Amino acid sequence: MRILHLHAHPDDAELFSGGTLALLAAKGHHVTIVTMTPGDCGSHHHSPDEIAAIRRLEAARAAAIVGAEYFCAEFRDLAIFEDDGARRRVTAVLRRTQPDLVITASPIDYHCDHEATSRLVRDACFAAPAPNYDAPGGDPPMKAIPHLYFADPAEGTDRDSRPAVPHLVVDIASVMDKKRAMLSAHESQRLWLKEHHGMDNFIETMEEWSAKVGKFASLAFGEGFRHYRMHPYPVSPLLEELLGAAAIRRL
């Protein structure tokens, strides 16, 4: 199966879904990680072009840890908007990668880029199989709407700090070393997250968030997802089928 993880920035895939991607890759599935932006605002010390170049390399190294491919859709930080051009560009990403299963950002999250990405990806999943919908790149329409899953928001909470309870939790305890390694590849973000987010150690924070999600399902570490099942999106439990019942706790 072909898996596409399309989130806003470099390090988002690793933070929210790195363990799940490691499990899927280990089972032989083809994993592609795409970021909407190269993270060009993620520094107080480098220019936008400098930090973007650094972060593209970091994202590629992180993806390679689990044998995944990486590329950037080349939007810019804090400039992802739900308009016609953006929707067509995201549709082009889906047609280029032809995924069976798509994971994207939570539609409710702390960052405007996360929320806009989530809605654009949802729309692109619908549009990608429509032959009369033009998108750049020249790739053929998809054969069908892919399965769509939303990753958890930051800290697993909504805007009012209430728990955002997922539909299912993936047991990632066996691949926490991979998740740590993937996130550690984003070395440039240690200082940024400390200075801008007040996050002293982003690896420890990731472990705390993963443990918090795991508690929903009595697991040591987990990653939560919501399956988008509105008409006409696929409703069969593909993620559970790919990972196996032992790795999934449905809530």
Each model region followed by its residue ranges:
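Metal-dependent de-N-acetylase/amidase catalytic core
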Residues: 1-4, 82-251
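Active-site rim/loop-helix segments in enzyme catalytic domains that contact anionic ligands
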Residues: 1-97, 127, 238-244
